[in-house]
Amino acid sequence: MQYLAIAVIVALAGLSAAAHKPAYYDDNMANQMVDQIVKSLTTKKELDPFKIEQTKVPIDKKIGLIHIKGSATIKNAVITGLSHISRRGDAKIDTDGGAFAATLKLGDKNIRIKTDLHLDLGKIIHPNLKFEGHIGDIDMKLKLKLDAEGKPSLDQFEIDEFEQVELFIHGLGPLDPLVDVIADSFVKYFNPQARKLVTDMLKPILVEEIKKLKLN
């Protein structure tokens, strides 16, 4: 299974450049801040397993002279392994034009997706399939801003596209040539939906957990 690397960019913006960097801006404090945020995410039951609502994915593609058109209904979709997220290496803090930024990487080797798939291609082809995959690199962008007293709050949070998705479809039999067509359609439409659902679920959790951050 491919290594999952999550690049998280924490930007602490809107601050005046100071002659001496405050204690909570050193690398140790950045690591401490990020570790608290990560811990709060990995302990949430909603995160693992993460369930995706039923959705219908359109299929419309030409292979040579053959035009394949129809849909695939995704049911009982579940992403597992998100709770294994952890920080790797130190957060690095740099200053640029009075802003502070920390870059770090989080890693995991257990991200998987499983779903039932009902294929509807014309009047004849309606198989029920089992669909599973391994998800590769995911980028996560997290921006924090500080008020005048140095208290952090969430400024921006988003998840980039799921890349390096390795998919396996069971139950096609003689329809195996359709694997690539189904996989391409799945990634194209599942990617934005899954990203939005994960983002919408995590964002309010982040807002509350950032309020609880304690820097020693």
From Swiss-Prot:
Annotated signal sequence range: 1-19
Secreted as UniProt keyword = yes
Pfam families for this protein: Grp7_allergen (PF16984)
Gene3D superfamilies found in the cross-reference section: 3.15.10.50
InterPro entries the UniProt entry points to:
Mite_allergen_7_sf (IPR038602), Mite_allergen_group-7 (IPR020234)
**Keywords tagged on the record:** Allergen, Secreted, Signal
The keyword Transferase belongs to this UniProt entry's keyword annotation: no
The subcellular localization recorded is:
Secreted
Show the GO cellular component annotation of the record: extracellular region
Q: Which domain of life is it from?
A: Eukaryota
For this chain, the family text in UniProt reads: Belongs to the mite group 7 allergen family.
> Mind telling me what this protein is named?
Mite allergen Lep d 7
- Species source reads Lepidoglyphus destructor (Storage mite)
